[in-house]
Each structure stands twice: as structure tokens, then as C-alpha cells.
């Protein structure tokens, strides 16, 4: 059986992305046919910064039509508009290749959101771009590993804005799309307020969540969604035995327990998209860039998910 062709966007080159590419290539090449969306010259510079620890000649790299950012000992670990623009163009090229079915899926390495902002990229990050590119699809950010997956009803929005987003019909649409994409038989839904609202004592959002759960289960014809569960106990061991699938109303409520338990191995999956896209579940790690300290478990798991 032929190996799948995977486009790998480079992420912010001032972070750990290029180290992950170089140190993981042999393992990645065993799972798939990787196409690295980065100029070969930058891979060579990265290897020099890593004391020429890796072999670069066999890597299949595709040049990006964007000015090459500086990459040297004085730029690493620093936010740069040039690096932001380059990482965006690498990601956009990956999407174009997936749209034209020249690759089977894409794996995105971490970007710096402030670098995108400085480069005047009009998107908060990868998922925001996908939501705009594929507007007819409800793109869902799900993070996790085989032991625990968390779907985010809201992702990169201020916590103060989440309450207004929690509306019954919007949540029903989200829940049904999440179930369709994951084929989960049971999904536990975290509440929004302390004690899941305590029957309206601590806010009305959880009453909306309950109505959305009831309507979604009725549509499906079985009791798929459980909750809303008090979020402070939703991830207790006895709860995680029920199902690995969860939904959180906000970013940190769902991801804090996930990363406490499975930070190194978790991945980021864009559900319900017309293309297959996964990412590492960590940032650029500027503080350890080009020190040969980057853990590649999340990256390898992302590749395995696609392959």
C-alpha cells in the first residue's frame, strides 16, 4: 500500500518547528511521504544552528513564494513579522495542495500569533483561517490523544465573550457536527458556570447547554451527550472511564486538564473540514529553540493520525 503524501507547513522558523522536522524526518518518512513547505536554504541554516546534527539532503522541500526571513543566533526565539509572513505562506500553500488533492493531508507546525499580527495577517491562527476559507463547513478545534479528546465550542476568543456565544441552536449545530466527525457514542459536555450553574443559581448559560443536549440527543435518537457536567469534576478518573470524548464551552476549561494529563502526546485536529489537517498541541517554544531539547512526541502522533 502506497504511503500517504503529507504536506508539512514549517511554522515559525524562530521556534522549534525546524528542529522537529530535522530530528524526526527518518521516523516521519517511515509513516508517510512528507513534503516540507520551506526553502531548503532555511533547513540548512537551521541545521547549522543545531550544530549540523542532522542530515538534510534527502528532505523533499518545496520553496515558498515569500521573502526568506533572517535565521541566525540573534533572531531565534524572537517575534518577527517576516517569520510570521513566511509561516502563513507555508500554511496557505499546504491548504492549496490539499484542496487540489496533490497531498492527502496537512500537518502544521506551531506559529506565533503575534508574528502573524505584525505581518498584518488577518487571521488569529490556523483554525481561524480554515473557518474563513471553508465557510460552508463548521470547523471544530479538537485536541487530545486516544485517551482523551476535547472539542472546543469556542476557541481563541476572550473568556468575557463566551457567555454570549452560548445559544441553544448554535450549540446544537456544534454538538451534532462534533458527533458526526468523531462518531462518538458518548460525549460528556462540560458546564460553563461553577457547579454547572446549580439550577440557575450561578447563571443561565447551563440551562441553554442542557436544552442543546436534549435537542441533540433527540435528533440523534440516542443519549449521546451527557451533561452539563460541573467542569471541576468532569475529568475525574471515574468520568474519563465513561468515554474519551468531551466538549468544553471555553478554551482553558477543556485544555487545562488535557495538557496536565497528556501534554507531550496530544495533537490538534480540525474536525469537519474538507481537508485533513492536524497540528502539534504546543506552541513555538521560543525559550528552547535550537537547543536540541524539543520533544517530538506530539508531532509524530500528528503524522501518525494522518498516515
From Swiss-Prot:
Q: Which Pfam families match?
A: PdxA (PF04166)
**One GO process term, biological-process aspect:** pyridoxal phosphate biosynthetic process
Q: Which UniProt keywords apply?
A: Cobalt, Cytoplasm, Magnesium, Metal-binding, NAD, NADP, Oxidoreductase, Pyridoxine biosynthesis, Zinc
| N-terminal signal peptide | none
Its UniProt entry gives the catalysed reaction(s) as: 4-(phosphooxy)-L-threonine + NAD(+) = 3-amino-2-oxopropyl phosphate + CO2 + NADH
Q: Per its database record, what is this protein's job?
A: Catalyzes the NAD(P)-dependent oxidation of 4-(phosphooxy)-L-threonine (HTP) into 2-amino-3-oxo-4-(phosphooxy)butyric acid which spontaneously decarboxylates to form 3-amino-2-oxopropyl phosphate (AHAP).
Question: Which protein is depicted?
Answer: 4-hydroxythreonine-4-phosphate dehydrogenase
Query: Which organism's genome codes for this protein?
Result: Helicobacter pylori (strain P12)
Amino acid at each position: 500500500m502506497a504511503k500517504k503524501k503529507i504536506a508539512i507547513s514549517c511554522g515559525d522558523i524562530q521556534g522549534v518547528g525546524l528542529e522537529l522536522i530535522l530530528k524526526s524526518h527518518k521516523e516521519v518518512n517511515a509513516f508517510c511521504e512528507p513534503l516540507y513547505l520551506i526553502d531548503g536554504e532555511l533547513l540548512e541554516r537551521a541545521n547549522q544552528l543545531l550544530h549540523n546534527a542532522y542530515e538534510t539532503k534527502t528532505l523533499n522541500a518545496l520553496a515558498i513564494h515569500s521573502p526568506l526571513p533572517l535565521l541566525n543566533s540573534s533572531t531565534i526565539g524572537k517575534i518577527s513579522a517576516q517569520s510570521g509572513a513566511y509561516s502563513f505562506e507555508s500554511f496557505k500553500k499546504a491548504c492549496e495542495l490539499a484542496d487540489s488533492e496533490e497531498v492527502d493531508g496537512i500537518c502544521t507546525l506551531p506559529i506565533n500569533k503575534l508574528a502573524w499580527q505584525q505581518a498584518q495577517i488577518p487571521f488569529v491562527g490556523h483554525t481561524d483561517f480554515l473557518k474563513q476559507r471553508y465557510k460552508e463547513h463548521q470547523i471544530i478545534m479538537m485536541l487530545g490523544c486516544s485517551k482523551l479528546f476535547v472539542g472546543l465550542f469556542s476557541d481563541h476568543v476572550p473568556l468575557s465573550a463566551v457567555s454570549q456565544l452560548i445559544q441553544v441552536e448554535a450549540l446544537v449545530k456544534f454538538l451534532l457536527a462534533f458527533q458526526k466527525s468523531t462518531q462518538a457514542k458518548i460525549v460528556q459536555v462540560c458546564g460553563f458556570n461553577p457547579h454547572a450553574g446549580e439550577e440557575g443559581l450561578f447563571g443561565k448559560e447551563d440551562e441553554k447547554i442542557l436544552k442543546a443536549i436534549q435537542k441533540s440527543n433527540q435528533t440523534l435518537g440516542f443519549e449521546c451527550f451527557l451533561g452539563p457536567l460541573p467542569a471541576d469534576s468532569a475529568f475525574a478518573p471515574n468520568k474519563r472511564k465513561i468515554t474519551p470524548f468531551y466538549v468544553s464551552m471555553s478554551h482553558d476549561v477543556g485544555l487545562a486538564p488535557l495538557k496536565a494529563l497528556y501534554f507531550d502526546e496530544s495533537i490538534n485536529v480540525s474536525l469537519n473540514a474538507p481537508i485533513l489537517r492536524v497540528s502539534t498541541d504546543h506552541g513555538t517554544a521560543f525559550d528552547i529553540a535550537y537547543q536540541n531539547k524539543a520533544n517530538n512526541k506530539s508531532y509524530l502522533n500528528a503524522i501518525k493520525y494522518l498516515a
